[in-house]
Amino acid sequence: LWGDVPLVTESTSIPRTDYTRNAVAEVDGVIDSDLVYAMSNLPVVGAAKNESRINQDMARQLAGEAYLRMGMRDASYFKKAEDAVTPIITGGKYELISARYGKYAAEPGDYYHDMFRWGNQRRSQGNMEAIWTFEMEYNRDVNGGTIDNPQQRRNWVPAFHKLDGMVNADSIGGRGNGRLRISNFVKYGLYEKGDIRNSNYNIRRVMWYNKPGFSKEVGIDAKGFLVDKDKGVRNVTLKTGDQVIPHEGDSLNVFYPHPTKWGAYDETDDFGYAVVKDWPVMRLGETYLLRAEARFRQGNTQGAADDINVLRDRAFKDYRAVAPGAGKVTADQIDIDFILDERARELISEENRRMTLVRTNTLAERIKLNGDVEPAAPSNKVITGFDANIHTLLPIP
């Protein structure tokens, strides 16, 4: 994030103004030492008093990502990255979720979506893919609890409450503000047919009016968008249960395809101030991607393809009933762009994307994908003024 920084390994109680920067390699040496100690001395998963306490596998996952960054400076770290995460994959303590489970198993949905639903996210709740789940306790059950916590739901869930005919509900992710939108690259070009990660349960593209007793006569324009009655090419009566028809301008923050991982609804807080469900920080799906990247960096493209295919076996499992072999990748398809695309497919809205792009030295190129290009014609939303020498590092706080 910052490049060379002052390295402080002992606490101090006296203000100092004479700090000087230490080289990244020197700082990395201390990070490496700390990670090795953590991987050896933290408890194994399930041994801590509380399941949310850190364990060896959390340290291994963190080490894998840190070593991949260090490997861009010293290639010997790529082998260390692979060695760090492999015990998570082979240790028998985790498994990719590939079947319905938990409290919503009888409801419409799919097994990938089950992982991200309130009450399904912890290992004790059946999520054996979870490595580290940051537990968000329901504040009204905690003496002195606060709701001033992460805002992911308000960021990622569109502002459906602005649509006539919609009411806040768990089925639509609660009340959002639509602060973030996935790019057109993700919406229209990232996913292949049959990928469960792009199902309507996971990237919601279609909705239905859910307000009880809703009925309204409206106009529809030549493009199929909602307009006032008698202002379009025809009138229709919309009712509860009909598919939502947006206004043309609603795609800014009211209605657009969005990941559903952060949706949740607390009926005692209809306004939906903050996140009430758990926060997935590390899971086995990313472990395979970290190892695939480490293998690719060592020239083992077949090993990288094997790891990615494990994820794709899960993602295309149902679709392969009608299209055998769908989603399979081969070694000659593997490069860093493919791995970054697969990270987006698997980890959309979960990973810190900027940090991933900075550590892979791809921010300058990949950020261009965010310049919205419509399916038919380019827009004028082009990112300009980017300087990789300046904009990949942050000022020291």
PLM feature spans:
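Conserved, well-structured interaction surfaces
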Residues: L1-W2, D18, N22-G29, L35-A48, ...
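Extended, hydrophobic/aromatic-rich amphipathic alpha-helical segments that build helical scaffolds
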Residues: L1-T9, V24-L42, E51-I89, W132, ...
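Short, mixed-charge aromatic SLiMs
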Residues: R16-Y19, P87-I97, R312-A321
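Long, intrinsically disordered, low-complexity segments
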Residues: V30-D32, A105-R175, F271-V281, A305-I308, ...
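C-terminal substrate/ligand-recognition segments
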Residues: S183-D313
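Surface-exposed patches in mature extracellular/periplasmic domains of secreted proteins
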Residues: V44-E51, Y77, L96-Y101, R320-P324
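An aromatic- and glycine-enriched ligand-binding surface/loop that stacks and positions planar moieties
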Residues: L68-G232
